[in-house]
Design a protein with these regions (language model features):
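Boundary at the C-terminal end of the N-terminal hydrophobic targeting segment
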Residues: 5-8
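Carbohydrate-interacting regions of secretory-pathway proteins
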Residues: 10-295
Length: 295
């Protein structure tokens, strides 16, 4: 009987893409579990603790249920519980009197890998320099908070995130952006993986600094320009392979393990939109172009 329980517990192992199911605002989380069915269970999580990829503070399996807890960045205790339902996880998160429900599916294997075989298609402009055509607010009912001025797309700093109407899979993305002192933004590629934008000239590189794959891959060097100067991103995404060139300097070349906190759609095997984060400080964008990559 004990062997059967251990085998059942091991089914929690792996990476899970999670959708919160009882909120009007779409949210996606990510969970990794290792060692379930042994005495050395551990895990990592992207979600409500603060948007980082956090090591799970306490995790265990009890009576066929996976359980883990956090004390989040506001000092609030959170309890997560999940059970297997066929190939899915069905779970809850309790925080005081609030309860959220969620569903997890196994993160997909994505076969596409970057290399010389990929060919560039037609380059398209995603921003016409005059209007918000092709873009929409990510949160329904929330004020947009963006305007177009002098050929640039500008956020006041308390704006709705913007996302493209179109969805994309493998591509090269070029854009120019400008941030003010202490400002913070981000670019969501496929709407799931955030490339950080931060005013951090002269600071050490890190997983939350400019050029990072947010909370996952730190830039190799700090290639940022001072606040108020226009900067460039050239981002290449093929499958899970990502390359980030900041101001002409390659700062990231790696493999994306899973979702970051910008994600609202957990369907990693599907194309997704480009997202511009507008709620963390003033930021401007211009000359946004995308080139599809195909074989």
């Amino acid at each position: 009987m004990a062997c059967t329980a251990i085998a059942a517990d091991s089914a929690f192992n792996g990476r899970w893409d999670i959708t919160v199911t009882n909120e009007p605002r779409l949210r996606a989380w990510w969970l990794e579990v290792e060692g379930a069915g042994t005495s050395s269970i551990h895990g990592r999580f992207v979600g409500f603790p603060g948007g980082n990829m956090d090591p799970i503070q306490k995790i265990w399996v009890d009576g066929g249920a996976l359980k883990f807890t956090f004390d989040n960045n506001r000092g609030v205790h959170q309890e997560y519980t999940a059970r297997l339902a066929g190939s899915r996880l069905e779970g809850t998160m309790k925080e005081g009197a609030t309860e959220r429900t969620w569903r997890g599916v196994r993160a997909p294997e994505i076969a596409d890998r970057d290399g010389a075989a990929w060919r560039e298609g037609k380059t398209v402009s995603l921003f016409d320099g005059k209007s918000l055509k092709g873009w929409r607010g990510q949160v329904p009912g929330q004020a947009l908070g963006w305007m177009v001025e002098d050929g640039a797309l500008k956020s006041t700093g308390h704006a709705n995130n913007l996302e493209t109407d179109g969805k994309f899979w493998n591509f090269k993305l070029h854009m120019e952006y400008r941030v003010g002192p202490k400002s913070n933004s981000g670019v969501g590629i496929r709407g799931r993986y955030e490339i950080q934008i931060l005013e951090d000239f002269g600071m050490p590189p890190g997983t939350h600094q400019n050029g990072a794959l947010y909370s996952r891959i730190a830039p190799r060097v700090n290639a940022s320009k001072p606040a108020g100067e226009w900067q460039t991103y050239d981002i290449r995404l093929v499958g899970r392979d990502v390359t980030v060139v900041l101001n002409g300097e390659e700062v990231v070349k790696g493999v994306i393990e899973g979702l970051t906190a910008i994600a609202t759609d957990a369907a990693e095997a599907e194309p997704g939109p480009l997202v511009l984060q507008g709620d963390h400080g003033p930021v401007e964008f211009r000359n946004i172009t995308l080139t599809a990559l195909t074989k």
